[in-house]
Amino acid sequence: MRLLSLLFLLGLATLSFAVRSQWAQQGRATHEALITIRFALTQQNLDVLERTLLDISDTTSKNYGKWKTAEEVTELVAPAREISERVASFLERQGATKVENFRDMVKVTAPVSWIEETLHTNLFFFQHKTRTSKVIIRADGGYKIPAEIAEHVDFVAGLFEFPSIKNARTQVGAGVDGYIVPYVIFDLYGIPTTFPVHPNSSICLVEFQDDQSYNKDDLKKFAKENEITETVVSHTVGPYSGSSADTESTLDVQYGGAIALNTTVWFWTVEDWMYDFATDFLNTKNPPLVVSMSWGWPEPEQCQVGNCTGDETSLEYVVRTNVEFQKIGAIGTTLLAASGDQGAPGDSDPECNSKKKPLSSIFPGASPWVLSVGATMLSNMTTEDADPSAEPPICKSWTCSTSTTELVCTIPQALITTGGGFSDYSLQPSYQNAAVAAYFKSGVPLPPQTDFNASNRGFPDVSALGHNYLIALSGDFEQVDGTSASTPVFAAIIAHLNSYRLNNGKPPLAFAVPLIYQAFASDPTIFNDITTGDNKCTEDCCSKFGYEATKGWDPVTGVGTPVFSKLLAFVQTLP
């Protein structure tokens, strides 16, 4: 029987966070309802944290791989102990139900009445207009931090986020260049299917918006049709309901789990945004070693997703969250983030008509403290058929790709265009100086210099396939495009490299971005160089502004896609 052939425009799980219109205010929240908020305390020694992380992640340093504990990095940047205790004690005296002092953040669970009185704000019930079962409590208006603690608090998180609940848009797809299944990925990048997985190697698929889940029956079907071991999620953090699977979570778990083989899999759902996730992660015992985040939103618009009210700005939110990302890298975890699905114009200019800001950056994909992942696609099929005996059953019903030539993933050939460019806020880190300088010296055409900051962090760092993936969803197979596909795949590759190191008594890769550039500098053929294509198009239009792929690193596909055997060989040389 022919399976359902729908092409899902999933891509990066971007957030339409001008989303207040999606929610209907239902009146004041009941006084006894409990909610959780976070007081972000003013930090110190941030320059020391950055220097330390760059030192222990430099493969040429004598300190390489000497990762820290969460307690060590938190104590480094936290305010004086008496300050955090003063804030926590004040909140306890005010009558909060539960107060947890994490040194540079105080987490409070309290009834609505307490929060309204303490922060001089008003809380309301909001009901989603289409998914009416979804009801949240949020503030309407500003808030005021009590004078007794105001000088020690940067902002309060958890009051203003309005989740964007979206259904994937669909389109019938021809799949003329062949479909992507785990078999194709293993073959293209040379990933062995019998790689010795260490029991402590782990990968975490993170979903935001608190409305994400996968279905275990879909995992069984996916494994059977692909002749692979069924992915088992052994750690679940946050809400999970397998009865209402969605495309994003399904893609992450099926491909992150499949390519990582038998690596321990975590599934983590978050109602709020990046700062909230990062602080919870840092306070988790024995957290996963690799984290894949297929979500993002324009850097200058973080106040639409984060907790900016009153004097806070998107810049301040990004800076503070980047500190938390540095801490995560320093304790031994690799963070990966998607580079976006709306090309260089991004979600700031999806209709390609902005004269003020024709190019966009994305967060966390443009953070210097995550491994930013772009997307490629394969060219037309080769004339020679693949060996039928080697193909899994799924390739009998669907024409799996046999091409080995990668191009930039871009509209109109694909349903998304890989994002890339330069951060609005973060300076260019030293680990990519040489690669970015070579790009500017290459002679490749550039956008007007007034439209981007060449001195800032360039992204993405790497890429992987992001077009024509097949996933099992609600009993059928469907197609998916996006950096939401490439990110968990590269995360799985990092998990394999971690297994090698752990099997040999070495620490995990952790903050692996400097390693990528040092590997590239030592031998550019460790990566497949993508030199055809650009990222000038969005879903709705193609702009005259954007970046072109060229030899070496570029703000389209980074240094390229992995040649696993060569990347492993480089990792094998490290202490």
Swiss-Prot record:
Record propeptide residues: 19-173
Positions of the Peptidase S53 domain: 179-574
Signal peptide positions (record): 1-18
Database matches in SMART domains: Pro-kuma_activ
Keywords on record: Calcium, Glycoprotein, Hydrolase, Metal-binding, Protease, Serine protease, Signal, Zymogen
Residues reported in the UniProt entry to bind Ca(2+): 529-530, 552, 554
Family annotation (CDD domains): Peptidases_S53, Pro-peptidase_S53
Post-translational modification: Autocatalytically processed.
Alphabetized PROSITE patterns for the sequence: SEDOLISIN (PS51695)
Record-marked site positions (DNA-binding): 529
Named cofactor requirement(s): Ca(2+)
GO biological process: proteolysis
Record note on pH: Optimum pH is 1.7 with hemoglogin as substrate.
Xref: InterPro entries: Peptidase_S8/S53_dom, Peptidase_S8/S53_dom_sf, Peptidase_S8_Ser-AS, S53_propep, Sedolisin_dom, Tripeptidyl-peptidase_I
PANTHER family per record: PEPTIDASE S53 DOMAIN-CONTAINING PROTEIN, PROTEASE S8 TRIPEPTIDYL PEPTIDASE I CLN2
Protein's UniProt name: Physarolisin
Biological source species: Physarum polycephalum
